[in-house]
Amino acid sequence: MVGSVGNGLVDLGGAAVAVNGVGKGMRPEAVAVAMEVESPPRPAEEEGEGSPTRREIVLGRNVHTASFAVKEPDADDEETGEREAAMASVLALYRRNLVERTKHHLGYPYNLDFDYGALGQLQHFSINNLGDPFIESNYGVHSRQFEVGVLDWFARIWELEKNEYWGYITNCGTEGNLHGILVGREVFPDGILYASRESHYSVFKAARMYRMDCVKVDTLISGEIDCEDFQRKLLLNRDKPAIINVNIGTTVKGAVDDLDLVIKTLEEGGFKDRFYIHCDGALFGLMIPFVKKAPKVSFKKPIGSVSVSGHKFVGCPMPCGVQITRLEHINRLSSNVEYLASRDATIMGSRNGHAPIFLWYTLNRKGYRGFQKEVQKCLRNAHYLKDRLKEAGIGAMLNELSSTVVFERPKDEEFVRRWQLACEGNIAHVVVMPSVTIDKLDYFLNELTEKRATWYQDGSCQPPCLAKDVGEENCLCSIHKK
């Protein structure tokens, strides 16, 4: 997915002068030491008239848009305390920037409504969950008792008994996908990976890392996998097992693949005992269980693994995730590590031991009913946003089981960056999370409609047609508007 969010430090760069400069609200004497925000001038082609409205992303170029310099303390710094004062000023400025950016956070699926003040006392400890969560190692400063409690909770949600699952808390959602696909590859070493074109980029990263043959499957207009195309491509490779990534909420459109139809397609195609399914539930994997009449993601079905992100719907302040697979598969990956006096079947080595505690804390505070209320609120507010957009004459789409509202990409990239909207081609989206209130949506909608009126007021250009992206019924361009 092509993102449109600027480096947060750029905003700070606007609030501080590069060398011995002064940030907004900062006393000159507090910053007049060697604490710098380094921000190089913009390339000439980005300035002046005729510059492109969309930023060009150039790979292979180490461009430092902004940075806080790291410099050696002065010899007398312990006596003067200037260094500490300068760092405190930079951190205060950065915090104000975070507060401001959080007010305009809509395009990425992070729940910013949390309070973990009670856990501050644990920040004094280096908590590291090395190795297998279920095996005690020589390292004693860990949180595996919290980790296993969290894993048991997710195993219950996905209907897998304690003695039948294995899992761990990952460092991010991508790691869950890397692990799930790796397990599939170990179960079927010559298997082909199938994933819809709208799968998260980490799925295709896994294919490159593991040097797997990968087949991209077409999608429906909703973003859901096209099982007719899936069937055609399966039959072209019927001599090799299938490893399938099933999306429980695609990145851009929030589409949920039809798991039951995927399984039916595999079985009818002659792959009954020759497939492994990994479910990427980064965001909606934890929302779907609380949606009435939604299809179940369950290990009672022939799936191999499920992963979710912990920093998205749950609202953990640091990136993390949960990966659950069947115990019968894990020995193919596991190996003894004498250094740890444990076994290891994870992707990473050291793992954040604080994350399981944050997850455990939230799961205990909210419980099943709490999450159910938050899911209902998100879906209700997402429908509100979609309806308001359409009332304003802006094409929009909302999938049935989703809180991701897809709509016409704003013409002004400054507006995109201000609201941190995720964009792809002619579309952008807002992901309605528990922290997104009706008031915030109204604020966004009012600003969008006001700005949009100026973008198209002279008639020199028209809003883009979204029919190919969201379907004719959801497009409100001059051609499809009824």
Curated annotation (Swiss-Prot):
GO molecular function, one term: serine decarboxylase activity
Cofactor needs: pyridoxal 5'-phosphate
Database matches in PROSITE patterns: DDC_GAD_HDC_YDC (PS00392)
Cross-referenced InterPro entries: Group_II_Decarboxylase (IPR051151), PyrdxlP-dep_de-COase (IPR002129), PyrdxlP-dep_Trfase (IPR015424), PyrdxlP-dep_Trfase_major (IPR015421), PyrdxlP-dep_Trfase_small (IPR015422), Pyridoxal-P_BS (IPR021115)
Superkingdom: Eukaryota
Functional summary from the UniProt entry: Catalyzes the biosynthesis of ethanolamine from serine. Decarboxylation of free serine is the major source of ethanolamine production in plants and ethanolamine metabolism is crucial for the synthesis of choline, phosphatidylethanolamine (PE) and phosphatidylcholine (PC), and thus for plant growth.
Family, similarity comment: Belongs to the group II decarboxylase family.
PANTHER family on file: PTHR46101, SERINE DECARBOXYLASE
The protein, known as: Serine decarboxylase 1
